[in-house]
Amino acid sequence: MKEIYHDIFIGNEQDYYAIQQESNWAVLHCCKHPFHCQFVGYRGTLPSTHPNYALKRIQNEMALNLVDMDRFSENYLDFNRDMFDTAFSFLDEYRLQGYKILIHCNQGESRAPTIGLLYIARLGTFEYADFDTSVQKLKEVYPVYMPKRNIFLTVKSLWRDFVLNPVEEVNT
């Protein structure tokens, strides 16, 4: 587990189990198995029409239906934008109450650090730098970062939706 911003940590499944019983943590589970499946109560696949298809919150924990794959598709950008927006509102709620935040996935190498990167960049951690610069800065503090293609390109595609960059001109 590594602190990447004041009281915001990224890590793996074992890091979650280490803090699970502590009351001053809010947790974002960035993995379908086992957390989203357990929170919603299913095995295998869930119909996309299910009300908790994208995510489910139980008190100070939220589980995302997020799988790590190499295949990227722009077809899921709107789905992911909405999911990340809801997840970041959840994290903001607890961060502003003084909770420590753990953003984790199974191995702590791909999904959690990438979503953690987007979240802390949105807070201004890297002075609203562009995506590639922010990735390099994250790698300096979290060298085990090895994103898979899908989550990497998804967050890169959504970067401007979440990270304001007052230095960069936006041509519309």
Give the role of each language-model region:
Residues 99-117:
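A phosphate-binding catalytic loop at a beta-strand-loop-alpha-helix junction
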Residues 144-172:
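Charged phosphate-binding loop/patch that engages nucleotide di/tri-phosphates or the phosphate backbone
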Residues 2-100, 121-155:
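Cysteine-based protein phosphatase catalytic domain of the PTP/DSP
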Residues 113, 117-120, 160-165:
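Alpha-helix boundary/capping detector
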